[in-house]
Each structure stands twice: as structure tokens, then as C-alpha cells.
Design a protein with these regions (language model features):
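Conserved SAM-binding motif I beta-strand of class I
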Residues: 230-236, 256, 475-480
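C-terminal interaction modules of eukaryotic adaptor/scaffold proteins
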Residues: 464, 474, 490-493, 499, ...
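A short glycine-rich, Lys/Arg-flanked "PGG" loop and its adjoining helix->strand segment in the class I
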Residues: 267, 286-301, 512, 529-547, ...
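Intrinsically disordered, low-complexity glycine/charged-rich regulatory or linker segments
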Residues: 2-205, 315, 327-328, 332-450, ...
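Conserved class I S-adenosyl-L-methionine
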Residues: 204-216, 220-222, 232, 248, 304-330, 341, 449-470, 550-571, ...
């Protein structure tokens, strides 16, 4: 879809470069520029003068631009206690707003975003002694202690080989609560249990997307990567253990989330395998609603790996009771046991609706209503029902997906659900291959082979940007803005991962998470929604690592506006701006701005 053309200039305007004649006009221009600069200062220091003030790039264009020589030189820095702030997962905010949350339903781990007057319009500082992260692939096994100063987990899990503190570094031997001898050996055993060729869990490319719930420090996901399996490692925000923060610092695909009351922000039929290794989730609560949510996101014939003492319940009466109830629930959901060995059981989901149709009338859990959209997943409550397959899936007896990596570039079967042709899909691939090649050419002198590991495409469309990075040693979090959430199913069908999000709110990740952010027409979209561009820039700064890069492709007016703020954001370590080649997805008004964030020290900034 082509972007909207830029708005016309105001009546009587001579454009941004129009000169002024006469003393009164010069004075008026200077006064307008000073007033605008003062308004920006009020915005960013935003407490007393105008806490909800938000300027839009189009408003700046319609009134008066910042004079060529004027740019905002600084932004306030948040207090050091906010160095790990996640605004929408802030426990302190719960108390300030007096939220009445049901802890038994894990509502305190779900998103609760601050209202506009309570947002911190300041830059999140790094912790004392912060260092540029160790590069992949070394980061899989070691990170700087100073970057995540939380060693409680190392002592608590010392007997399970999760992590070990060695002076200024934290090492990850690859252990876990259920796999003391290493995740790699555990993964081989799972493949053997399922009888997969060559003892490889990828099953010749047919297992690609995995959901790991309660993932610890994501060592399971880390050791799946050599098999060309990508896991969405999921765990709640824990102020004491910071498991996901360690995973992201290691460069392992992971995100903050919880099985609570709302659906996971993923479409139906996204994963070939879900994994729970002593994940401490009560799967039996509320009529099995949490297990039914896993069922929703599993593909036809998908596997659920459950490694827990309850699966080996011969001697413990409590475990025997749980195992009996769990087995009964799985059977009523039409799951069958594919393999069981020791403390691990693997269930498999049916390929068709046949078993569902053969259940007794009024059997529980019920089938979901016909008008339920299984792909609706942004702020949607979970439902204790089974999602049936469409007529097409039921007839095909499966997801109709090619093995990895062929599925990356082949038109996915669900394209027709969002009204996109195979031809347009292929053209989209070609366009993004060309765009990414141009971006890397622009950055060539400034980056090295492993400069990027954690990458986010903030407006992912069909996943073309991520697909073009396939031969680079990176992983990409593809974000589908909630207005276009239907496209996320295409991204998953390509063997990529991602999430739904509303960029008017903060993202659910720790500060200093991503090496590269890509924002294509995102600022224009936020402007259309009436959301503050400055809020988005500050959020990008929060999640971008020092020495990280951002690629912003948008209207010229937006790019010019952002450039004025680079010094204040400390994004002026290096930058490049070009007018890109015209293609079927672009307009003549687009520009590309690539910037690099500085590594700055809070104490030094305060002293200067």
C-alpha cells in the first residue's frame, strides 16, 4: 500500500526555505522560532508548564520550523533508580494508581501503562559502569556483570548451572532446572522421543517456531538456534531475577509476557511446538484456560512438551492427582500423547476437526463461538474454549507450510485472508532486499560483522525487512502495530517471530535491549493517531543500546524534525541521510535517516 502524500503547505505559504524581507518579518520569524524552542523545552522538561503538551511534525511545518542553526541541545536524564524502567510493567505504578489487581490471576505481571501526566519525559540512564555489550556469538555464554547487576539468580540456581558469576562477567553453562547436564543434550533427547531424523528437533525444517513459557534465562532457546529453530522465550517481569533481561543481553530471542487473563499477543497457529520445563504454571486453573491459550497458538499437529515432576508421578500422591487431571484435560482437548519418558511428556494437537466433532454434546471445554476471531490478540481476554480449524485447514490436514527455509520466501497460505496476492508478496520481498542492501551500504564504514544481534522492525508489514536479513547473524522482533495485527500471521507463517503492539504505549522490554531499530513510516502513522512523536523517540532511546543504530524512513518533514532532536537524544554519534531510490512502496517525499546512539555516562553528564 502506498503511503499518503504529504499535506499541502498552508495557504499563502512560501515553503520552509522562503526568505523574509524587512525588519518586522525577521523579528517575527525569530520570535516564532524562540517560542517554538521554548515550547519544546517545556515539553521535555514537561512538568510545570505543560505536562500533556505534544507537538506534531505537521504542526511544526504549518507554523514555523526551528531555525537552521537551532536544535534542542539536551533532554533531562531520569533518576538512576529508573535505569531498568519498563513503564507499562512498573510495579511502583500499581501502587501509585491504586490498581486493584488479582494476584492469583497474574494481573500484576500484565501491562498497565501510565497515563500521560505520569509519563517520564526523560532519558533512561545506563547503570554505573555500563559497558558496550559483548558481541554475539560470545554473548551466548557470557555478559558483563555491570550491565545487569543482579547476581541473586546465580546463587539461587547454582546447583542447576543456570549462570555463574566470574568477576566482571556472568557465564551461562547452559543448564536449567530440568536439564542439569545441558540444554543441548535435553533437546537431542526430545528429538529422540519423537523419532525425528538424525536426532534433530527441527525435523528437517518442519519445526521452526517454538514458544518457551517460563523460560528462565532462555538457554533452551539458545541451544535451538544451531538447529535453525527460533524460540519466542517468554517470562514475566521479575524485579528480583531479571531472567529475560539476561536472555536479551545474551542475544537470545525473548520477551516479557505472562499467561494471565489476556491472550498472548500472537495470532492463532503460530508455533509448531510449545515448551514448559518446570515453568510453575497451574495449567488446571479456570477450566484449563491457560492450556487452551497454548492450544490457540499451536499449529495443527503441533507439540506441547511438558517437563515436570507431575509427569513422573508414581510415588507422590499430590503429583499423581495433578497428572490425572492434566491427562484428562488434554484428552478432552483432543491432544494425544506422542511420547512419554521420565519426567517429560509430549502431547500432539490434532490435524483436523475430526476429534472435536466426535466429542459428546456439551463436552468441556466447549468449542469457541463462530464469531470469535482467534487472531484477535491485542488486549483481548482469554477464553476457555477450543479454537476449531477453518474449512481450508481442516481439508488440508495441516498448516500447508513448506519446511524452513523455503517457507521464508514462499507465499504463505494465509495471504488470501488479508487480501494480498502472491505476486504482491514476491514484489515486496524484492523491494526489501534492495532497501536493506542500500541501508547496509550506507552503514558499511561504521559497522562490523557482529555490530547487530538484537534487531526490531517497529512496523514490520509482511516481514520483508527481517527476511532480507536471513544471511546475517541476527534475530528480528517483528512488530505489527495493532491496527494491522492481521499481518502478523503472515510473519509467523514465514518462520519469523514477532508481536502486536500499540506504539502510543511503551514496549514490554528492558532498557538497552536492541542493537538496531527500523522504523518505516511509523512516525507518520503515530502522527495520524495523534500520538506524540517525542514520546516515541524517547521510547526508542530507552530500548536501544548505546552504540546502537536506528534506521528511520519517513516523510521529509518528519526526518527534518527528528534531525533537530538528535543532539538532545544523544543520537549524534554518527548519522547519514539520503533520498532513497523510488520503489512501489515509497513516495517521492521519503527520506532515510540512519543514526547511532552515544554511550554516555550519567555522572559525567551531571558534572559537565
Amino acid at each position: 500500500m502506498k503511503p499518503h502524500p504529504p499535506p499541502p503547505p498552508p495557504p499563502g505559504s512560501r515553503g520552509w526555505g522562503a526568505g523574509a524581507t524587512g525588519r518586522r518579518r525577521a523579528f517575527a520569524c525569530a520570535l516564532a522560532g524562540a517560542a517554538l524552542a521554548f515550547a519544546l523545552l517545556c515539553l521535555f522538561h514537561g512538568a510545570a508548564f505543560g505536562p500533556t503538551l505534544r507537538l506534531r511534525a505537521s504542526q511544526v511545518q504549518a507554523q514555523a520550523p526551528l531555525p537552521d542553526g537551532l536544535a534542542l541541545s539536551s533532554l533531562p536524564v531520569c533518576d538512576a533508580r529508573h535505569s531498568e524502567l519498563i513503564p507499562c510493567l512498573d510495579r511502583g505504578l500499581h501502587h501509585q494508581l491504586r490498581l486493584r489487581l488479582n494476584l492469583s490471576l497474574m494481573e500484576h505481571y500484565e501491562r498497565h501503562c501510565p497515563p500521560a501526566p505520569r509519563r517520564l519525559n526523560c532519558l533512561i540512564p545506563p547503570p554505573d559502569g555500563y559497558l558496550v555489550p559483548i558481541r554475539w556469538p560470545r554473548s551466548r555464554d557470557e555478559v558483563w556483570t555491570a550491565n545487569i547487576p543482579h547476581t541473586h539468580l546465580a546463587s539461587e540456581k547454582s546447583d542447576q548451572r543456570w549462570m555463574v558469576v566470574n568477576g566482571d562477567k556472568i557465564n551461562f553453562p547452559g543448564g536449567g532446572t530440568h536439564f542439569h547436564h545441558g540444554a543441548d543434550k535435553y533437546i537431542v533427547n526430545l528429538a529422540q522421543m519423537l523419532g525425528f531424523p538424525n536426532d534433530k528437533l527441527n525435523n528437517e525444517g518442519n519445526i521452526r517456531n517454538v514458544l518457551d513459557v517460563g523460560c528462565g534465562v532462555a538457554s533452551f532457546g539458545a541451544y535451538l538456534l544451531p538447529l535453525d529453530i527460533i524460540a519466542m522465550s517468554l517470562a514475566p517481569n521479575d524485579v528480583h531475577e531479571n531472567q529475560i533481561q539476561f536472555a536479551l543481553e545474551r542475544g537470545i530471542p525473548s520477551t516479557l509476557g505472562v499467561l494471565g487473563t489476556r491472550r498472548l499477543p500472537y495470532p492463532s497457529r503460530s508455533f509448531e511446538l510449545a515448551h514448559c520445563s518446570r515453568c510453575r504454571i497451574d495449567w488446571l486453573q479456570r477450566d484449563g484456560i491457560l492450556l487452551l491459550e497454548v492450544d490457540r497458538v499451536l499449529r495443527p499437529g503441533g507439540y506441547f512438551v511438558y517437563s515436570s515432576p507431575e509427569a513422573y508421578a508414581h510415588h507422590d500422591p499430590a503429583n499423581r492427582k495433578i497428572w490425572k487431571q492434566m491427562s484428562n484435560l488434554a484428552q478432552r482437548m483432543c491432544w494425544r500423547i506422542a511420547s512419554k519418558e521420565g519426567q517429560t511428556v509430549i502431547w500432539v494437537k490434532p490435524l483436523t476437526n475430526g476429534c472435536y466433532m466426535r466429542r459428546e454434546p456439551r463436552a468441556l471445554p466447549p468449542m469457541c463461538a463462530h464469531d470469535d476471531d482467534p487472531d484477535a490478540a491485542w488486549n483481548v481476554l482469554m477464553k476457555a474454549c477450543i479454537t476449531p480449524y477453518s474449512k481450508r485447514v481442516n481439508k488440508a490436514k495441516g498448516a500447508e507450510l513448506l519446511p524452513w527455509p523455503q517457507r521464508l520466501t514462499a507465499p504463505p497460505p494465509r495471504l488470501e485472508e488479508i487480501g494480498i496476492s502472491s505476486k504482491n508478496f514476491s514484489e515486496d520481498n524484492e523491494i526489501w532486499n534492495s532497501r536493506v542492501a542500500q541501508y547496509w551500504k550506507l552503514m558499511k564504514s561504521e559497522i562490523q560483522k557482529y555490530s547487530f544481534r538484537n534487531v526490531m522492525d517497529m512496523n514490520a508489514n509482511l516481514g520483508g525487512f527481517a527476511a532480507s536479513l536471513r544471511k546475517k547473524d541476527v534475530w528480528v522482533m517483528n512488530v505489527a502495530p495493532f491496527m494491522e495485527s492481521g499481518k502478523l500471521k503472515i510473519i509467523y507463517d514465514r518462520g519469523l517471530i514477532g508481536t502486536i503492539h500499540d506504539w502510543c504505549e511503551s514496549f514490554s522490554t528492558y532498557p538497552r535491549t536492541y542493537d538496531l531499530l527500523h522504523a518505516w513510516l511509523l512516525f507518520s502513522e503515530m502522527e495520524n493517531q495523534g500520538c506524540g512523536l517525542e514520546d516515541l523517540l524517547i521510547e526508542m532511546d530507552r530500548i536501544m543500546r548505546p552504540h546502537g543504530h536506528a534506521i528511520i524512513r519517513d516523510k521529509a518533514a518528519v526526518i527534518d524534525y527528528i534531525k533537530k532532536l538528535l543532539p538532545a537524544l544523544r543520537w549524534d554519534d554518527w548519522s547519514s541521510e539520503v533520498k532513497p531510490k523510488r520503489d512501489a512502496l515509497s513516495s517521492d517525499d521519503e527520506r532515510v535517516l540512519i543514526v547511532r546512539k552515544k554511550l554516555w555516562d550519567q555522572a559525567a553528564q551531571a558534572a559537565s
